[in-house]
Amino acid sequence: MKKENSETKEKKKHKFLKRLLWIGLPILVLIALIVPTNKYIEVPGTTEPVNQMITVDGKKDTGKGNFYLTTVQIAQANLAMIIYSHFNSFSTIYSAEDLMGSMDSAQYDLVNQFYMQTAQNTAVYQAFKQAKMPYELKYDGVYVLDIAKNSTFKNKLQIADTVTEVNGKTFKSSAEMMKYIQSQKVGGDVNIKVTRIDGKDYSFDGKFVKISTGKTGIGISLVDHTEVVSTPKVKIDAGSIGGPSAGMMFTLEIYNQITGKDLRNGREIAGTGTIETDGTIGQIGGVDKKIATASKEGAEIFLVPDSGSKKADDNNYLAAKEAAKKLKTSMKIIPVKTLDDAITYLETGKVND
């Protein structure tokens, strides 16, 4: 009798645990799917035709072939996404600090829009300069992107402020401004004037500090605030896409339109890379994901920055080749260091040394 009672209790216990498992498992799955973590996941984004974003003198490019910019998608990760990333070589997990530094998500998005605006202005400038056509580049100061902990302007400046003067001096470029600042002594007095997003002007006093490079600074991360006036007029509308990495592709599309040249020759050409005021093509993040999305969309050629470094972590070209090998794609990976390199390849098929 005792044995039967014991067996009955075991059966009831087994049934209870089974029910608990069936109830608990969906709850755990739901938690994994909807509860966010403090991590972010980066995965392949989209491949967007640039000719749909740019008008020159009110007209779009209707020629054969396309230039494409490429994006990554970043989202706050849940547990399921983190697990997924361990089995997908084209996804990366970042902490909030690694991704955004001291910024919140709203500030991060705003900064990326400033990067995009600068990329567009520099693209117009470089395309018209390359084509030897009339343009005017206006330097309005520098956008404040981040403020260092040791900056004496930490609780005075705001992200998105435009610094217009330092100690009563105005400048023609951020490089000129930084040269002046670096010539000053750490601990010396400094006054800066800024313009806020609302258009109001402010003046703040502080001290020069030693920054992470060991040089004198005021403790801010910055990007040029510029405007470009060109003839004919160029308009770029990239929607909600942010960041600087479409600079090269914008430049090629604008150059293609204003010169009447056919750089594409009917080809589907994707790429990534910043465009700098001296014509160099700068490194970007997430190049492996951009190779993945471009390959998926059928691009024939991918133009990618080549820093010259022998390490893939420091050279987009090497990282892109590794990604292409994993994907077994037939898409050609073409290294470029300057805008001239990109144009030369598209016109002749030759890669500059």
Annotate the PLM regions.
Residues 18-36:
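Hydrophobic membrane-insertion alpha-helices, especially the h-region
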Residues 129-159:
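PDZ/PDZ-like groove recognition
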Residues 278-310:
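Glycine- and Gly-Pro-enriched alpha-helical subdomains that act as flexible
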Residues 1-16:
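N-terminal Lys/Arg-rich, disordered targeting/topogenic segments
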Residues 131, 178-222, 323-341, 345-348:
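PDZ-domain C-terminal substructure recognizer with occasional recognition of PDZ-binding tails
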Residues 98, 105-118, 147-150, 164-167, ...:
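Second-shell loop/turn segments in exported
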Residues 153-177, 294-307:
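Conserved PDZ fold ligand-binding element
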